[in-house]
Amino acid sequence: MTIALGKFSKDEKTLLDVLDDWLRRDRFVFIGWSGLLLFPCAYFALGGWFTGTTFVTSWYTHGLASSYLEGCNFLTAAVSTPANSLAHSLLLLWGPEAQGDFTRWCQLGGLWTFVAFHGAFGLIGFMLRQFELARSVQLRPYNAIAFSAPIAVFVSVFLIYPLGQSGWFFAPSFGVAAIFRFILFFQGFHNWTLNPFHMMGVAGVLGAALLCAIHGATVENTLFEDGDGANTFRAFNPTQAEETYSMVTANRFWSQIFGVAFSNKRWLHFFMLFVPVTGLWMSAIGVVGLALNLRAYDFVSQEIRAAEDPEFETFYTKNILLNEGIRAWMAAQDQPHENLIFPEEVLPRGNAL
């Protein structure tokens, strides 16, 4: 006979179990292991952005005023990118550029790299939070998969594109008017609106908006008249077993309108997920192409004919001339460190301008 000394209990918890309970079970607001990445990164990204837009100038990097302290408002304030001369330096506070001097670090554009990287990891942390919580309550991870699309766009625009160019300088600054300037830059230097990946992105976003509006209206139109609540939001029990709206009625309605309709809710909702996520992913892939200076569609035959025949012009050739104008007028003021001076005779002129 074997005699065991001591007792074994399944209730004994390791330090990892205690930490897991503290992060995931013992609180009203879920933190989770993903929160160890999400919350610090989100805090630092937002804190850096508010600090930069409130106090920090862009005079030393772009020759611009960019803070509330200098007279900007919410639409014109920004955390601007570092100077072009700093290339792809991480601009660490303790690095060789700032050498631990916080004021100098801000003047050099250190807040931009700080916000960009903490923002990227904060978004990744939020996606992991959705994965973790879905696994905890035994849901499928489609929310997290969908959120990968805006992450792909953020990473491609703010990190991969400038990595393919000469420095962080050519990334968007974090501000409303600054993003508008970046969009004009993308159009003038990359003809972005004629890029097929941009077209797919626009189709995805606008198509998703259309699907969302149609779906919401259809559900409202086909609600069962049930319950004694004062309004739609109180008329149904959230734990009810029966349907809230009539899928059959909705199917018959759209079959009459379009001739075709979704036959079941699974395909309908998957399509509503697929359209915007695919559109954003395609747009992100297109921006990666721009990082490598890949070109959009070029209709050279139209350009040659327009150059030879002053009476021939298409919307494409007009846009090409406008892009030349953006490049010529924007480069000099957008990159003052290059000391670009364009003589009058090389500035674009033509039927479009």
From Swiss-Prot:
The keyword Amino-acid biosynthesis does not apply. The chain crosses the membrane at residues 41-61, 125-141, 153-166, 208-228, 279-295. It is an enzyme of class 1 (oxidoreductase). Chlorophyll a PD2 binds at H198. Pheophytin a binds at Q130, N143. Its EC number is 1.10.3.9. It is found in: Plastid, Chloroplast thylakoid membrane. It catalyses: 2 a plastoquinone + 4 hnu + 2 H2O = 2 a plastoquinol + O2. A plastoquinone binds at H215, F262. GO terms for molecular function: chlorophyll binding; electron transporter, transferring electrons within the cyclic electron transport pathway of photosynthesis activity; iron ion binding; oxygen evolving activity. Keywords: Acetylation, Chlorophyll, Chloroplast, Chromophore, Electron transport, Iron, Magnesium, Membrane, Metal-binding, Oxidoreductase, Phosphoprotein, Photosynthesis, Photosystem II, Plastid, Thylakoid, Transmembrane, Transmembrane helix, Transport. Fe cation binds at H215, H269. The modification Phosphothreonine is found at T2. PANTHER family: PHOTOSYSTEM II D2 PROTEIN, PHOTOSYSTEM II PROTEIN D1. This is Photosystem II D2 protein. It comes from Welwitschia mirabilis (Tree tumbo). The gene is psbD.
